[in-house]
Amino acid sequence: MGTHRVKGAVLCGGTGSRLRPLTYYFQKTMIPIGLKQKPLLEYVIRLMKYHGVADVALLVNYKAEQIMNYFDDGTRFGVRLEYVHDDPNYRGNGGALLNASRRGVFSGFDDVLIYYGDILTNLDLTDMLRIHREKDAAATLALSTNYTVSVGVAEVAGTKIVSLREKPPLGKPVVIGVLAVKTEVLEILEELAKPQQELDIMQHFIPLLIERGYHVEGYLTDAFWYDVGSTERYEKLDPHVVDEALGFLLA
């Protein structure tokens, strides 16, 4: 990546309420995944390292000690890890990002690669960051083009069903929880921050960038991705599929 410096930021602070009862015992990013039963977060960190992002901040809160005990300073994984404990006064993933920015975690870096900690993907981060730089975008969001609706969809004429498709492709790209942001635009989070109020990256921060005319790029991909954010989704995740898509990270 030459002199262009990128820092990873993984959102690891959530309590994982939709993953209970697992998260009574595990931090949600530490739940075992795949045939080798490695923590979800290990796949995330190894993917970043694979694509040359070796400086990574883990934004932690709930059961942070599990993450810290397992990954330590990151040497074993070839990365430099920094732990940033969430400020309880600023809630939501946007609050966690603001807190890290205020502490100078991203100083000296041109971009921040933000990764939602309950997402599995083999997304080509190198290519996404290249597009982000070439387009000189304030933010670039990974968008999946292969999302399927989880229910049957009917096409109707009046009340008559003329076609029925079970779990069809959505037909529109969906946000998958990986994005690159210019470090300098993180200061806009300050305008949105209110103590004890939820601040969300996708709900508040990105829409404000768009509203103000900043260039927000979409990086379209058909890469494998999976949201492991609920017990139902976790139980449906085939470990063989994980190893097929992400096994190269553990080789």
Where are these regions (language model features)?
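Conserved N-terminal catalytic core of the sugar/cofactor nucleotidyltransferase
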Residues: 1-10, 18, 35-115, 127, ...
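Active-site metal-binding loops of divalent metal-dependent hydrolases
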Residues: 15, 117-119
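Short alpha-helical oligomerization interface
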Residues: 24-29
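Residue-level signal for inorganic ion chemistry
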Residues: 41, 67, 100, 118, ...
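Short, high-confidence coil segments that cap the C-terminus of an alpha-helix
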Residues: 53, 109, 136-137, 213-214
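Catalytic-core segments of class I nucleotidyltransferases/pyrophosphorylases
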Residues: 113, 120, 129-133, 146-148, ...
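A short, conserved acidic/glycine-rich loop-to-beta-strand motif
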Residues: 135-145
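Short acidic-glycine loop/turn motifs at beta-strand connectors
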Residues: 155-160
